[in-house]
């Protein structure tokens, strides 16, 4: 059991039989009242957020959270197959767990598989990936700076907004956290 006073961002706990990730935790004490710990928790299976206030004397059950480095191999039906780099074991991850992150899967890309109680609950990608632009409208001469953006389709099927000077065939760096353009990469 983990005292709620020790809760930190990134901890995984079990609450009412479900696993939650601590997004935020603040110790709060009003005058002449008991101290509380106010938390924001994310349900690891459903993805919804809740806010919960604990008495400072409470304890919660700590979940077994771990990460394993893996390499993407191929898609099979509605799941994706990864190989654990430590022991070469193959793991199937459902499309529901990946969600729109599937657009960052390139052959042999390395990711971190998040496990809670020996079950894959999430896939963490590198913060930036480099992808090639397969379609975008042509830019105009002189459009080298500015904040005007246009849509571009990338090699994996994802569409991101890019500056006007980006052309078909350019390689760009994309932020996987918010699907945004970062910069053009030299070939």
Curated annotation (Swiss-Prot):
Signal peptide interval: none
Pathway: Protein biosynthesis; polypeptide chain elongation
GO CC annotation: cytoplasm
UniProt GO BP: peptide biosynthetic process
Main localization category: cytoplasm
InterPro entries assigned to the protein according to its UniProt record, in alphabetical order: Elong-fact-P_C, NA-bd_OB-fold, Rib_uL2_dom2, Transl_elong_fac_P/YeiP, Transl_elong_KOW-like, Transl_elong_P/YeiP_cen, Transl_elong_P/YeiP_CS, Transl_elongation_fac_P
Subcellular localization, as worded in the UniProt entry: Cytoplasm
Gene Ontology terms for molecular function: translation elongation factor activity
Keyword annotations of the record: Cytoplasm, Elongation factor, Protein biosynthesis
Pfam families listed in its UniProt record: EFP, EFP_N, Elong-fact-P_C
Stated role: Involved in peptide bond synthesis. Stimulates efficient translation and peptide-bond synthesis on native or reconstituted 70S ribosomes in vitro. Probably functions indirectly by altering the affinity of the ribosome for aminoacyl-tRNA, thus increasing their reactivity as acceptors for peptidyl transferase.
NCBIfam families registered for this protein in UniProt: efp, PRK00529.1
Entry similarity comment: Belongs to the elongation factor P family.
Protein name according to UniProt: Elongation factor P
Source organism: Brachyspira hyodysenteriae (strain ATCC 49526 / WA1)
